[in-house]
Design a protein with these regions (language model features):
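Amphipathic cytosolic juxtamembrane alpha-helices at the membrane-cytosol interface
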Residues: 7, 97-103, 163-164, 168-195
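Interhelical loop and adjacent transmembrane-helix boundary motif
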Residues: 211-259
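Membrane-embedded alpha-helices of multi-pass transport/permease systems
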Residues: 26-30, 83-90, 122, 135, ...
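Generic hydrophobic transmembrane alpha-helix motif, especially the helices
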Residues: 110-145
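Glycine/proline-centered hinge or cleavage motifs at structural transition points of membrane proteins
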Residues: 85, 116, 174-175
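Periplasmic/extracellular loop-to-transmembrane helix junction in inner-membrane transport proteins
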Residues: 2-8, 12, 32-79, 238-248
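Alpha-helical transmembrane segments of multi-pass membrane proteins
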Residues: 65-73, 77, 109-116, 161, ...
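Transmembrane-helix boundary motif in ABC transporter permease subunits
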Residues: 76-109, 122
Length: 261
């Protein structure tokens, strides 16, 4: 076969593949945005209304409890994970640890990144069972912090590794301490660090499997770290197949909110 014909065939296949991926993405996002948008246009109060007493039976109420639950779980867990991940990423640099050991630790975090999120949930669930505790907002925060950590660590590590050695060498030649050198490197690596934080936060915000066992799934507003708390992904999972059309509408509204968050 002529090499130009081969090249043309591969170009066509690449274009078709790209089109299929884009069409699939548009369909997934489009269906949820359209259906969720229709629900919000008909009843915009659904996002600022707490669920009523007969919420799961098609009664009055909205998804405010799940929105607040997601925010109260994701924001603290991201803060905890960022602080721990930054220290770990700094430790992985050649200034603090030998290259062979740092490479082994990177493999560990790569493996942790690939572990299904439900495994994190089961791990925390076992701890709750051993300590005779129920699912709660606090347990959800810990679960999501662990879930985000491998993602944020690897992004921060790669961002810090991309800092030119000249910056570190210049800092040391001027008498800077390791801490001062790390701060200088962090400023240079800030875009990559922020990207890692956003990736970790996005993974936590959209994950249902890890918190379905640990945070509980009540229909009440969050009341404390030791109390159960709903979240948007879990609400979607539970209500998307409901017999009541009004309950299914809550799931579409939650999908719309989750996409734009």
């Amino acid at each position: 076969m002529n090499k130009y014909v081969k090249e043309s065939i591969f170009k066509v296949l690449m274009v078709i593949s790209v089109f299929i991926v884009i069409a699939y993405l548009v369909m997934i996002v489009g269906i949820n945005v359209v259906k969720g948008g229709i629900v919000l246009i008909k009843n915009p109060a659904v996002v600022v209304t707490a669920p009523g007493p007969k919420y799961l039976l098609g009664g009055e109420g909205g998804i405010l409890h799940a929105i607040l639950g997601s925010i109260l779980m994701v924001v603290p867990s991201t803060c905890i994970s960022c602080a721990a991940s930054y220290l770990i990423a700094l430790f992985l640099q050649v200034d603090y640890i030998k290259n062979k050991l740092s490479n082994k630790l990177r493999v560990v975090f790569d493996v942790l990144w690939g572990i299904p999120s439900i495994i994190y949930g089961i791990f925390i669930l076992n701890i709750l069972i051993i300590t005779n505790r129920r699912g709660s907002l606090g347990a959800g925060i810990i679960t999501l912090a662990l879930l985000q950590m491998p993602v944020i660590v690897r992004y921060m590590d790669e961002a810090l590794n991309s800092v030119p050695n000249g910056i570190r060498e210049s800092a040391y030649s001027l008498g800077a301490t390791r801490l001062e050198t790390a701060i200088a490197a962090t400023k240079y690596a800030l875009p990559g660090i922020i990207a890692g934080i956003l990736m970790g936060m996005g993974r936590a915000m959209g994950d249902a499997a890890s918190v379905i066992f640990t945070s509980g799934a009540g229909n009440s507003m969050p009341k404390g770290l030791s109390k159960s708390a709903a979240s948007l992904p879990v609400l979607i999972f539970q209500q998307a197949n409901s017999f009541y059309p009004s309950v299914r509408e809550h799931a579409y509204a939650a999908s719309f909110v989750l996409i734009f968050i």
